[in-house]
Amino acid sequence: MSISLFSLAIDQTSSMFFYLSQFLSFLALPLTITISLIVLGAFFIQRKWGKRSLWAGIILLWFFSNPFIANQAMLAWEPQFKAFNEVGNHQIGIVLTGVTNLSKTAYDRTFFNKGADRITHALQLYREGKIKKILITGGQGLNPVNPQSEAELLQRFLVMTGVPAEDVMIEDQSKNTYENALFTKDFLEKKGIDVNQEFILITSAFHMKRSKACFDKVGLQTETFPTDYYSNDTKYDVPTLFFPDPYSIFIWHKLVKEWIGILVYKMVGYL
C-alpha cells in the first residue's frame, strides 16, 4: 500500500512539473511573444506605444525567423559531436528516449521522429565495440496513446537489427529526464551492475547539458555522446542570411523550451 502511494506521489509530482514547464515555455516561446506584440499593437495602433508594440513584434518575428541567426544560436548551444574513434570503450551505453511517435500505434514497426540518431548511433557504437550493452530509458510519457513504452519499441527495433536480446536492457517507467537518471541508477543497482563505472550517455545534442547534469546529480558518471543535431554548418548565402524560414522559429522553440526546462529543474532541485 505504501509503495502504491509513493508511486502515485511521484506520478503527481512529475505531472505537476511537466505542466509547469509547458506553461512557462508557452509564455516564453518566440511565436507567443511576437504574436502578442503584433496583436496588441494592431488593437492600439492609434497610440504611440501601440505602434511601437507592432513594430517590435514585426522586428522580432524577422529575427526569430532568420535562418542564419537561429542556426548560430543552436550552434552555440549544442556541444561538438565526437568521432566514433575518439570514444572510449564502455560496458554500457545509456540511450534516452523521446525519438518515436507514441501517438501512432503499431505492433510490427517503430515510427521514428527526428531524434532517431539516438538509437541508430547507439547501434553504431555497439557494432564498433565501443559498448557491450545498450540500456534504453524511457516510458510512455504523460497522457500516452500507445500502450507500448518507448523503451519497448526501441528494444524491439534493436533486436530486429540483429542485436542479441540479452544485450538490450530497458527501464520503462521514467517520464522525464530526471527520472531517466534516477530510475536508471535504481535499475542498475537492482541488476547488481556496478554504478561506479563510467557509462556512455547518448541523447540529442540540444538536450545533452540537462541530461548530463541529471545523471551527475544522481551520482552516475557518464561520457557524453551527443547525437541528433539541429544546427548546420555555417553558410553565408542570400537565402540563409535574409529570407525568413518557419523552421528557424521551430529551432528557437526547441532552445527556449530546453532553457525553461533547465530553469524549472534547478528550481525543484533536479540539477
What are the roles of these predicted feature ranges?
Residues 23, 30, 49-56:
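Alpha-helical transmembrane segments
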